[in-house]
Amino acid sequence: MARAAFLFKTVGFGGLQNVPINDELASHLLRAGNSPWQLTQFLDWISLGRGLATSALVPTAGSRYYQMSCLLSGTLQIPFRPNHRWGDVRFLRLVWSAPTLDGLVIAPPPILAQPAIQAQADRAYDCDDYPFLARDPRFKHRVYQQLSAITLLNLTGFGPISYVRVDEDMWSGDVSQLLMNYFGHTFAEIAYTLCQASANRPWEHDGTYARMTQIVLSLFWLSYVGVIHQHNTYRTFYFQCNRRGDAAEVWILSCSLTHSAQIRAGNRSLFVMPTSPDWNMDVNLILSSTLTGCLCSGSQLPLIDNNSVPNVSRNIHGWTGRGGNQLHGFQVRRMITEYCDRLRRDGVMTPAQQMQIEALGDQTQQFKRDKLEAWALEDDQYNRAHPNSTMFRTKPFTNAQWGRGNTAATSAAIAALI
């Protein structure tokens, strides 16, 4: 059904006393313009680049995603105070330029002389509680597209959440023909185009764009775990990965008439998220969650079960609740094994090819782990030396998150969708 509740959740502090962002990071985020709602800003923090490191301040593809979540989590607590005053207090050195939240600017001297707002961690806010958003549905949609995306990252201590739905009714109308227009394009390119479409105008609930986005997500995830491939497609479609296990996997929308999987009637869906920290370096997983955020901006997705999220994320209207859908986690490297096992059983991959891919996956994971842990150590050292200017460049993680997790069960749950 169409979305009626427009709540969003702010970031946790990861053990720090304040939002994990400082003036230097905030300035870097806003270097292209002072509005965090600009389409260019939104697509920028999705980060479509293939490189694992982009700059010292933005070392991974997931860094800008997390940092923008921190920036919005702090600055939006100014107008969402009970009195809704928007320009009398600053976050860091920033204030909103207008009550319509058009942009962020350096606070004037009188406000700079006053203490900054002390933002709170893990708060849920309702867009309709702020009068200027409640009165402008179109602007609220554009804002909520991004607030949905950061909520999908902030609900847990792991990676961003994606929604996967399989329903034959989604293929009605001209969706198949429109999907053919993306034949030969990468998942990243398709996601980029759909994000632009969502930002330009609200999607109708279960309209063509919303249905096509859900189909693209289902094709990606069914391909990601090896359920569909060139010998077992979903209505002739699947995503072909050119170098599975590589640091920069590219998934290309492909077609094959060899064999189509038998799809059961009905509507089946689940939520999935990477639990290992190397999601930070996987643009495809980030884009999948961003597309889910686009869906959330216009449609009310099923609730995520309270037992799948921490206490601070439970019973958020429109997001989590009792009796909701289970949130399935997986370890990125382990999912490569699930993918290879299925393709080998289906005769698409030889044992030698699997060994080669898994060896590449091991090398890639170790490289990513070394980088992420080095950056985390640098951030910890910086925060101890600068207690009044703390920050994290990537979302905090623990060593336990590198464990195998529930990957096999998650892979089976995705496979069971068809």
From Swiss-Prot:
Checking InterPro entries in the record gives: Sigma_1_2_reovir
Recite the UniProt keywords alphabetically: Capsid protein, Inner capsid protein, Virion
Family to which this protein belongs: Belongs to the orthoreovirus sigma-1 protein family.
**Subcellular location(s) of the protein:** Virion
Q: Which Gene3D superfamilies match?
A: 1.10.287.1520
Q: Which domain of life is it from?
A: Viruses
Q: Which GO terms describe its cellular component?
A: viral inner capsid
Q: What is this protein's function per UniProt?
A: Inner capsid (core) component.
Q: Which organism is it from?
A: Reovirus type 2 (strain D5/Jones)
Subunit comment? Interacts with protein mu-NS; in viral inclusions.
Query: What is this protein's name?
Result: Inner capsid protein sigma-2
